[in-house]
Amino acid sequence: MGRSISVSFGLLVVFLSLSGTGADQDCLPGWSFYEGHCYKVFNVKKTWEDAEKFCQKQSNGKHLATIEWLGKANFVAELVTLMKLETHVWIGLRVEDKRQQCSSHWTDGSAVSYENVVHNTKCFGLDQKTGYRTWVALRCELAYHFICMSRVPRGA
């Protein structure tokens, strides 16, 4: 009986250590799972456009991260904070029309249903000064770190 409890406890420790790493949700190594998607913050700086292209090249279905509700915003903020970056971080939102209005869609095509915008400019990133919890308008041609997101493959 004592040995059975010891083995069960050992398996529980292994399971808990893998939670959040993506290992138990079929995310690639280094990616983190949340609500059906995998996320990764890249410790390299790129312009908004180059960051989006980089995300797309990682695999089909990958884009700069979309933030569609507060729970996801908090998850992404914590993930970015763990990287201990000292700069803004690109997300997948940018102005796409001449009236300087926000696009109604994220880079992955999903509708914008949650907004946390401070100012209206062309590209948006997470503001380091607020612990990555608010969006800040940034010049698209500046290079910042970025966070990519992908759907977990169906049937995985």
From Swiss-Prot:
C-type lectin domain span: 34-149
Gene3D superfamilies: Mannose-Binding Protein A, subunit A (3.10.100.10)
Record localization: Secreted
Disulphide-bonded residues: 27-38, 55-148, 123-140
Highest taxon above the source species: Eukaryota
Record keywords, A-Z: Disulfide bond, Hemostasis impairing toxin, Secreted, Signal, Toxin
Chief subcellular location: secreted
Family annotation (SUPFAM superfamilies): C-type lectin-like
Cleavable signal peptide: 1-23
GO cellular component entries: extracellular region
Record flagged with keyword Signal: yes
GO molecular function: toxin activity
Additional remark text: Shows greater sequence similarity to the alpha than beta subunits compared to other heterodimer snaclecs.
SUBUNIT field: Heterodimer; disulfide-linked.
Function according to Swiss-Prot or TrEMBL: Interferes with one step of hemostasis (modulation of platelet aggregation, or coagulation cascade, for example).
Similarity field: Belongs to the snaclec family.
Protein name: Snaclec A12
Species this protein is from: Macrovipera lebetinus
